[in-house]
Amino acid sequence: MFDAKSFLANVSHDAGVYRMYDEKDTVIYVGKAKDLKKRLSSYFRTHLSSKKTEALVSAIARIDTTITSSETEALLLEHNYIKTYQPRYNVLLRDDKSYPYILLTAERHPRISAYRGSKKIKGEYFGPYPHASAVRETLSLLQKLFPIRQCENAVYNNRSRPCLQYQIGRCAAPCVAGYVTDEAYLQQVELARLFLQGKDQQVLEHLIHKMEQASLALDFEEAARIRDQIQAVRAVMEKQFVSTERLDDMDILSIAYQLGIACVQVLFIRQGKMLGNRSYFPKVPANTTLSELTATFVGQFYLQAHQGRSIPHRIIVDHKLSEKTELEELLTQQAGRKVHIQDNTKGEKSKYLQLAKMNAQSALVTQLKQSTLLKERYQALQAILQLGEIRRMECFDISHTMGEQTIASCVVFNQDGPLKSDYRRFNITGITAGDDYAAMEQALLKRYDKPLEQEKIPDVIFIDGGKGQLNRALQTFSKLNVKWDKNQPHLIGVAKGIDRKAGLETLILSKQGKILHLPSDHLALHLIQHIRDESHQHAISGHRKKRQQAFLQSGLESVEGVGAKRRQTLLKYLGGMQGVKKATLDEIASVPGISKALAERIYDALRD
C-alpha cells in the first residue's frame, strides 16, 4: 500500500509535474502543479472531490515528480508525458495525425499540391484543412480557375509535349517552351495565391482590369478567355461561406458529452472562410469536467510541433478554463506570436460557436448510435461463442498474385472497434508459391511465437478460410513454446459461402467443435464480416504496395552498379519506371552519375 505520509514529507513546494504509477509500474495519471506539495496533498484528504479521484488514488503504488522552472514549462511537460505514457486516468486525444495543407512551391514554375507533415519544402503553405478530401476539392477548384501545374517534378522535367491537363485548359504547360511565358504563368500563380489567402475581390479586380486591357488591344479571344475566368471565380465566391466581419485565423471548439462519450468539434476558419470541420472522440475518464476536458484537449491538440500542426491567432472555446493564461503563454511561445484563447464570444464569432455546438451534438448522436450497435454486435458474438467477455479479437488474411509477393495481414478489434495502431502486415517468404496454408502458419508464428503482455492476448482469432486453414492454425498453436496462455484464444475459421457472397459464410468453431450457419441479418455475423473485410482490405493494400515496389525495382535491382541512389536518380530524371524502359541508350547515359558503360548494361537488362 502506498505510504502517502512519508512520500509527502519529501515533496517540495516548487512548480512541476507528477506521474502516478500502479502496482505494475504503469503510469496511470500525469498532472502538473504550481505547488507540487499542495497539489499532491489534496489527493490524500479524507473527502475527495470525485469518484474518479477516489479510483485513481486507490490504484497508486508510487509517485514520481519533476520540478520545473515555471508553471508554463510544467504545462508543456505534462502534455509531453501524457502523449508518451497514454495514462488511463487522463483525457487522451486518439487522433494524432498531422493536417493536410496546400503547398505552393518556390520554383521557376511553381507547383501547387497537397502536403502533409513537417514543412521542409520551400514555398507557401495554406491551411490547415480538416480532411484530405477538402484539399482535393480545393485543388480541383483551383485547376478550373487558374492553369497552374500540379505534376511532380519528375514528370515536369521530362515532358517533350504538353499533357492532357493542357488540352482541357487546366494547365498552362510551362514544362514545354513556347506555350506560356514566365511572366504570364507567374501572374496566374499570384492570382491563385490571392485566392488561397481569401482575397477574392482583388482577384476579380485584377481579372477585370486585364479583360479591359485585352478589349482595348482588340484581343477579343483573350478578353473572352478572361471573361470566362471571371465568371468561374464569381460562381465560386457565391458558394463559399464568407464572414461579413473580418476575422482572424481561428479555430472554434465545442464539446458535447453524453453516456460516457465526448465529441470535440473543431471548426477551422482562415481569412474569414470556414475551411471545414472535424470531430474528435477523446478517451475521457469518468467524472471528468468539461472544463478539464477542454483544457487538456487544447494542450494535446496544439502542442504537437512535430506534426506540423498550425496554431491559429485565436482559439474560441465554450467552457471556462482555469489555466487559460498559462495555455495562452505556452501557445504564444510555440507559435512565435500572440495567441488568444477566448471563452466568451459576441457577434459573428458567437454564430460560429453555435454552429460548432450543433455539429458537435449531431456527431455525438451518430457516434452513440454506432457505439450502441457495436456493443449489441459484441454481445451477440459473445452469446454464440459462449464467452463471458471479448476484449480483443484478431483476424488474419493472405493476399498474393499467382503466388507472388505474398502478404499476410492481421487486424485487431476491441470493444471500441478497429484498433488500427495494432494492425500488422507480414512479408511471407520461403514457401511454395500459392501455398496459403504455409503462409498462414508463417504469419501466426511471426505474430504469436514470442512473449505477449496479458492485454495483447486475443480472446478470439478469426482465420479467413475453411477447415484446412483452421486445422493448420490449430497445429501451429499447438507447437508454440510460449509462457502466455496459448489456449486462451478461441480460433474460428470463416469459410466463404457459395459464390463467395457475403451473408453465406460458414463459421467453424474450434473449441465447440461445431459449424454454424448464421442468418444474414444476425448481429454477430455483421461484426465478423466487418472484421474479415477489414483484414482483407488491409492485406490487399499491403500486397499492392509490395507489387508496385517490385515493379519499380524490376530490371534495375539486378544491374551491377545500380544501387538505391542511382535507381532513384534514374526514376526521377526519366519520369518513372515506364520512362526508364522507353528511354534510348543516349537518354540513359545523359542521366547524372550514369556512365556510357553502365547505361549499356541498364539498356540491355531492360530488354532481356
Curated annotation (Swiss-Prot):
The compartments listed are: Cytoplasm
PROSITE patterns in the record: GIY_YIG, UVR, UVRC
Q: Which biological process annotations from GO are given for this protein?
A: nucleotide-excision repair; SOS response
Q: Does the keyword Cytoplasm feature in the UniProt annotation?
A: yes
Q: Could you tell me which residue ranges the GIY-YIG domain spans?
A: 13-91
Q: Give one Pfam hit by family name.
A: HHH_5
Q: Which SUPFAM superfamilies match?
A: C-terminal UvrC-binding domain of UvrB, GIY-YIG endonuclease, RuvA domain 2-like
> Which cellular component terms (GO) are annotated to the entry?
cytoplasm; excinuclease repair complex
Query: Does the UniProt entry include the keyword Cytoplasm?
Result: yes
HAMAP family to which the protein is assigned, alphabetical: UvrC (MF_00203)
Function, as annotated, reads: The UvrABC repair system catalyzes the recognition and processing of DNA lesions. UvrC both incises the 5' and 3' sides of the lesion. The N-terminal half is responsible for the 3' incision and the C-terminal half is responsible for the 5' incision.
How does this chain assemble?
Interacts with UvrB in an incision complex.
What name is this protein filed under? UvrABC system protein C
Species: Pasteurella multocida (strain Pm70)
